[in-house]
C-alpha cells in the first residue's frame, strides 16, 4: 500500500491515530498473506503462503453460520480473534449498533495490507471499532480495555476464526483469557461502584465540609510526599502470622516507620507496640470496632477521604491525614488518564491537591502505595499472609477475634467459627513461603497478584517477613532473622517525623482554596433546591429525558452529586427498552429524593 494514503484513510487516522502505526513499515517483498477468490462467486478468503485461513469454497456461509450461532446483545462487547475470514468481520459489524465495541485481533501485522481498503477501512470508520494486529499491539489493547467505561457493557462475545487460531493457539488462548479477565475485573469494579459509590460521594463531601471541625486536626498526604526518603517501612496487616512476629517487631522498632492497617491495630497495642500511623479505608461505619477501647490519641490516622465520617468525628487521634484513591491509566490514544474516586473533584475544589494513593482494593494495598509515596524504602510486609494460614482468618487479638470470643460455647470453638467462614469462601491452594501449599481464596489471591505486579515496577526491594503465608512473587520472602540482618545496615531513625505537622498538630497550617463553612452552606442550598424541584407533583407528568436534563442543569458546579443516582441512571439505560416512561420517572425521582435526603442528614450530623 502506498504511503500516499487516501483522504478517507487519513480521516480515520485522525480519529484513531494508533492505526497509522501499522502502515509505517510497508513490506517490500511479496506478502505471505493474499486475498483469494473462493469457489462461490463474490466471496473471498485470506491465504498464508498458500494455506487457506477460512473456507475456500463458501467463506460467507461459514461466517453467517458462526454469527447466527451467537446471540449478540446491543450491550455486548464483541471481539473477533483471527481475521482470516473477511466475511466474518463484515457480518459481525452489520449486527452491531453504532458505537458498540468491536475488537479485531490478529497475531500478524501484515494482514492489514490485503484487507484494509475493502474490508477494514469501512469498519474502522465507525466509532467503537478497533483493530489490534501483532503481539506489540496487545499492551495497547489491554490499556484500551482498562480505560473503557463499562456502564453500558453487559458481557463479552468472542468469535474465533478457527483456521487463524490453529496457527497460533497459545497467542489466541492467552488473548481470550486476558480479554475475559479484564472485562470481568471491570464488571466487578462497576458492581463495587454501584454498591459503594453513593457512600463514597456522601462521605467525601461530608469529610470535606468537616475538614476544619474538631476534635481531630486534619492535613493532607500531599504535604508528606517524599519526606521519608530512604527510611525502611514496616507495613503491618492482620494475617494469622502477625502474632508470631510481634516480639520481633519490638526488637527492630527503632529502625522502621511502622504503618498499621486498622485491623491489626489492636494486636500491636496488646504487645505494647505503638505504630507511627494507622491506615483506614472503609467507608462503612462498622470499621469503628477496630478502634473502640484503644487509646489512639498519640497516633495519626491516615484516612482516605471516603472513610466513615463518624469515626473521624467521634474518635480521638493525633491528627487525620487525608488522601484520595486514584488510578492512572493509558487510554487508547496513548494519553495518561487519572481516574479518582467519586467525590474527589468537589473536595479538591476546596482543599486543593490532597494527594493520590493507588489501591488494589484492600487497606494493605492502599497503605503500601502510601508508604511508597512517602519515600519509604525498602518496605517490609508483616502479617501479609494473604492466605488462611492454619485455617485461620485473622491473627488472634483483632476485633473479629474479640467478637468471636463472645460466641464460644461448649459446642462452638474458635476453630469451628474459623472453619465455617473458610468453607463459605471460593478457596484454592497457592504456593506457601514454606515451600508447600497454603489455602487462600479468590479475593486474597487478587491482592497477592496486586502486590506481585506492583513490586515489578519499583526500584527498591520488598521483603515479605512471613513464616507460613502465601509466597508473594517479585518480593523477597524471608524470615525475621534475615530481616533483622538487613535492618542492621540502617541507622536508627530517631523518630524524626515527630516534628512533622501530622505528629505535631499545633503547627498544622492548611492553605485552603475556600471556606468549609461556605462549602457546606452552598452544598445544602443546592440539595434543598433539587429536593424542592423534584418534589413538585407536576414533575410526574414530564418525560424521563426532560427530568434528566433538568437534574444535570440544577447540579451546577456540583457534578459529583450525580454519582448519588448513577446506579439508577445506568439501570434505566440498560433496561430502556423494557421500562415504560412512568416506571423510569418513578425510579429517577425516588432515587433523587432518597439520596439527597440522606446526604443532607449526614452533612448536618454532629452539629449542635
Task: Name each model-derived stretch.
Residues 94-101, 253-254, 272-275:
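Conserved S-adenosyl-L-methionine
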Residues 1-77, 85-91, 190, 194-200, ...:
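Class I S-adenosylmethionine
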Residues 121-129, 279-284, 292-298, 321-322, ...:
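Acidic, Ser/Thr-rich peripheral helices and adjacent loops at domain boundaries
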Residues 74-76, 226-234, 255:
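A short, charged/proline- and glycine-enriched loop
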Residues 446, 455-608:
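Long, compositionally biased charged/polar accessory segments in the mid-to-C-terminal portions
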Residues 360-361, 411-469:
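Polyanion-binding loop/helix "lid" in catalytic or ligand-binding cores
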Residues 107, 112, 116-197, 269-377, ...:
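Acidic/Gly/His-enriched mid-domain segments of enzyme catalytic cores or analogous surface patches
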Residues 81-89, 108-111, 136-139, 162-165, ...:
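Gly/Ser/Thr-rich loops at beta-strand to alpha-helix junctions
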